[in-house]
Amino acid sequence: MIVFFPACLRHFRLCAWHEEGAPGPEERPKAFLSRTMSSQHDDEAQKEAAFAAEHLAAESMAADMDPWVVFDARKTPRAEFEEWLQTYQPSRVSRFGDPERNAEPVGWIAVYGPSFCPEGGDVVGLQEDWERLQGSGRHITFDTVKELALNRRVLTGKWLMHLDSGFKVDHAWRGIARAALEGRIGVAKVSPCCPDSERKQVICVYTEDFTNEEQVLVADAVIRATGVKCLLSYKPDVYTYLGIYRDNRWHLCPTIYESKFDLECIPRRSRIINKVNNTEVT
């Protein structure tokens, strides 16, 4: 078993919500009660969304900080790959370990391809820029977040696929892991199972630059060539580093591409939507 401890810890900040101004004196007799109730409802919805985003961020950070099971094709003989793959099938590796078998928690199972190079970029500087951006009063959009990522060279991103635990995730992971071993993708990882949960497991396939659309599309083609036909979503890592998950206060969609496999098209292919500008790119 090869164990990897991430060197970079992520920092997250839960931002305060801004309330609307109170109604003027002439409005209060008619509107004060309804606006107060509406404001309270909005505050509750915002708090729930903030809690959900914070919870997802905490879960992600916890998984990243726990030991990873890694097959590193740069160092490990390929002859050992099949045994490793069989030993660490994602549906049989427990996220929280097994005290009875003296098994420790596992954050992720990953394969590093032969040309894998750890991501660069200034994550700490990125997070400092993010703090300043939030305090500046500027409207926060995909383009402003992209600007931060470009300035700090934090450009990696990943295709995500969510699969039922058991045969489906094990079969899909086998194809994806082999693609990484052969160098068709740089790195891929899969979440371990949670035995007492119905939550699906997720496979992530990384690209070096989320702003390079051609690179993103090539990775989708590699995934489809392994036989994966489920819905795929693409998320820039900058969103993860900044703690931007679904239901965030800026109403940003944390995924910027969506890929659906068209079974009726001949030849069969992906239909990929750019979710930022709502255009079909394939």
Q: PLM ranges: what are they?
A:
Residues 5-6, 34:
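Intrinsically disordered and other compositionally biased segments
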Residues 17, 29-155, 246-282:
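Charge-rich, low-complexity segments
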Residues 21-24:
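Residue-identity detector for glycine
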Residues 128-281:
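Extended amphipathic alpha-helical regions
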